[in-house]
Amino acid sequence: MTAIQQFFKTFFLTELLKGLALTGRYTFKRKFTVQFPEEKTPISPRFRGLHALRRYENGEERCIACKLCEAVCPAMAITIESETRADNTRRTTRYDIDLTKCIFCGFCEESCPVDSIVETQILEYHGEKRGDLYFTKEMLLAVGDRYEKEIAAAKAADARYR
């Protein structure tokens, strides 16, 4: 580019006018912003949200205290304590998930041999203080009991890919 061409480009502000033209074109196009609480976008069927512990149909909890989920968790967000029952089966006495540490990777769900721990489609939960995001076994079982139909439907829909 010669010096004369550079002078005319600078003198007539062509770069500035190109930028203004681009801005003007996008000013009158439809916006892509979603007003979240009022408008909701579709959630992927494989979305990983709030955790839940499931039970069998007879009401017994599924977790066999194998501690695979605790071992595989990269964020070390899961804490499990167990004891042996009279019939020589292990069950959990403590199953805690710290959601402030959890990265929602889904490894706990993949490693569970009995599909006890699952990640639901729930994304709207909050805590006013740090302790509110520390889920105990009872809280996780309550989530599982409340949303069992949705969890079972999601598992059935995803069975082909597992």
UniProtKB/Swiss-Prot annotation:
Its EC number is 7.1.1.-. Binds 2 [4Fe-4S] clusters per subunit. [4Fe-4S] cluster 1 binds at C63, C66, C69, C112. Signal peptide: none annotated. Residues 54-83, 93-122 form the 4Fe-4S ferredoxin-type domain. InterPro entries: 4Fe4S_Fe-S-bd (IPR017896), 4Fe4S_Fe_S_CS (IPR017900), NADH_quinone_OxRdtase_chainI (IPR010226). Keywords: 4Fe-4S, Cell inner membrane, Cell membrane, Iron, Iron-sulfur, Membrane, Metal-binding, NAD, Quinone, Repeat, Translocase, Ubiquinone. It comes from the Bacteria. It catalyses: a quinone + NADH + 5 H(+)(in) = a quinol + NAD(+) + 4 H(+)(out). GO terms for biological process: aerobic respiration. GO terms for cellular component: plasma membrane. NDH-1 shuttles electrons from NADH, via FMN and iron-sulfur (Fe-S) centers, to quinones in the respiratory chain. The immediate electron acceptor for the enzyme in this species is believed to be ubiquinone. Couples the redox reaction to proton translocation (for every two electrons transferred, four hydrogen ions are translocated across the cytoplasmic membrane), and thus conserves the redox energy in a proton gradient. HAMAP family: NDH1_NuoI. Belongs to the complex I 23 kDa subunit family. NDH-1 is composed of 14 different subunits. Subunits NuoA, H, J, K, L, M, N constitute the membrane sector of the complex. This is NADH-quinone oxidoreductase subunit I. It comes from Burkholderia thailandensis (strain ATCC 700388 / DSM 13276 / CCUG 48851 / CIP 106301 / E264). The gene is nuoI.
